[in-house]
Amino acid sequence: MQTGCEVLMQTASNVIQDKAAAAAGLKAAVRILDKWRATGEQGESILRVSHSSYARARRGDLAEIKLDSDQLARISYLLNIHAALRMLFENPDNVYGFVSMANHNPYFNGRTPLEVIGTGGDFAALYETFKRIDSLRGAQW
């Protein structure tokens, strides 16, 4: 049986690991957004982070950044959109350019996926965009 001190140390270790994973996810998400040529405002809206947090993430200064569950979910969807695009396309221009291409499917109605997810910070738009891009890959997972 663990002592109270051992439980606290284990909990602290889990928190540190979770913070490190969250920071790594944020850093990856910001890099992807940069490759998608998202503006800072779009990136901040998509991830629902402040201007200063986004700027720190771009610099790799992640020590003081705290993320809530909504922000972590947004990072997860963005990383999964990127993973789906990497499965669909071998050409890096398509992997990173797809989100900036006008899409005439009913949900997008001529808008780019980046316009849809980068306007207003709507979580549902991020989810719906992920769902539609993910469906393109069929059973490739």
Whereabouts are the PLM-identified features?
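Non-transmembrane "mature" sequence context
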Residues: 1-141
